[in-house]
């Protein structure tokens, strides 16, 4: 960490390499300790009419799970939901599901909702969500297949990597890139300063 910033101990409760890079871009020192909570089980039990609440709930559960083992740290946790027509598009995990997701999203508008939470000593200090709205081009089968072979975005909600070649799939985007990537930086920066986790 540079001398410009003074900070308290921070943990990022996420295994996402993109969130790791975004946090690093802020010049912070932090540990990475992913949560062991069962996301799929929580999603299955949740009411589909309260999707933003689901994202916030997942972020809180992740942060609280890690906080019980690291009470001296401020825990930052996040969750990302890709939603179209009140349906959540989870990570496809394989090629066949990714093809299906891109077919369904082709030519349509969908939302990427980034949910954040900061916890210390098992107390929730801050929670936040931000939405980006994206519209894909009408994608041919050839385009879908070529894109998936090029990037294999099977660990990405929506079956695309916006930080890479995925940008070429879109005709309109409303919202910040870091929201699409799952970690809205300016709200997080302001929260860390307001909570006196980071000082300048």
Swiss-Prot record:
Assigned EC number: 3.6.1.9
User: Nucleus among the record's keywords?
Assistant: no
Do you know which InterPro entries this protein is assigned to? ITPase-like_fam (IPR029001), Maf-like (IPR003697)
Q: Which cofactor does it need?
A: a divalent metal cation
Q: Which GO terms describe its cellular component?
A: cytoplasm
Predominant cellular place of this UniProt entry's protein:
cytoplasm
Q: Which UniProt keywords apply?
A: Cytoplasm, Hydrolase, Nucleotide metabolism
Can you tell me which residues form the catalytic site?
A: 79
Q: Has the keyword Hydrolase been applied to this entry?
A: yes
Q: Tell me which domain of life the UniProt entry assigns to the organism this sequence originates from.
A: Bacteria
What catalytic activity does the UniProt entry give for this protein? Answer: a ribonucleoside 5'-triphosphate + H2O = a ribonucleoside 5'-phosphate + diphosphate + H(+); a 2'-deoxyribonucleoside 5'-triphosphate + H2O = a 2'-deoxyribonucleoside 5'-phosphate + diphosphate + H(+)
Q: Where in the cell is it found?
A: Cytoplasm
Gene Ontology molecular function: any one = nucleoside triphosphate diphosphatase activity
The GO annotation for biological process reads: nucleotide metabolic process
Q: What class of enzyme is it?
A: hydrolase
**What is the recorded function of this protein according to its Swiss-Prot or TrEMBL entry?**
Nucleoside triphosphate pyrophosphatase. May have a dual role in cell division arrest and in preventing the incorporation of modified nucleotides into cellular nucleic acids.
* Family membership noted in the UniProt record: Belongs to the Maf family.
PANTHER family in the cross-refs: BIFUNCTIONAL DTTP/UTP PYROPHOSPHATASE/METHYLTRANSFERASE PROTEIN-RELATED, BIFUNCTIONAL DTTP_UTP PYROPHOSPHATASE_METHYLTRANSFERASE PROTEIN-RELATED
Q: What is this protein called?
A: Nucleoside triphosphate pyrophosphatase
């Amino acid at each position: 960490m540079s001398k410009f910033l003074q900070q308290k101990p921070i943990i990022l409760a996420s295994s996402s390499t993109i969130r790791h890079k975004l946090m690093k871009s802020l010049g912070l020192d932090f540990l990475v300790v992913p949560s062991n909570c069962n996301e799929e089980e929580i999603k299955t039990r949740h009411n589909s009419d309260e999707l933003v609440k689901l994202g916030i709930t997942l972020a809180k559960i992740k942060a609280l799970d890690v906080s019980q083992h690291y009470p001296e740290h401020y825990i930052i946790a996040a969750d990302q939901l890709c939603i179209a027509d009140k349906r959540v598009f989870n990570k496809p995990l394989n090629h066949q599901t990714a093809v299906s997701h891109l077919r369904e999203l082709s030519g349509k508008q969908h939302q990427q909702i980034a949910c954040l939470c900061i916890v210390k000593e098992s107390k929730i200090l801050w929670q936040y969500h931000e939405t980006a709205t994206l519209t894909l081009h009408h994608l041919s089968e050839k385009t879908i297949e070529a894109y998936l072979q090029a990037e294999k975005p099977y660990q990405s909600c929506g079956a695309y990597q916006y930080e890479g070649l995925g940008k070429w799939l879109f005709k309109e985007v409303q919202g910040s890139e870091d929201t699409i990537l799952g970690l809205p930086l300016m709200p997080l920066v302001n929260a860390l300063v307001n909570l006196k986790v980071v000082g300048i």
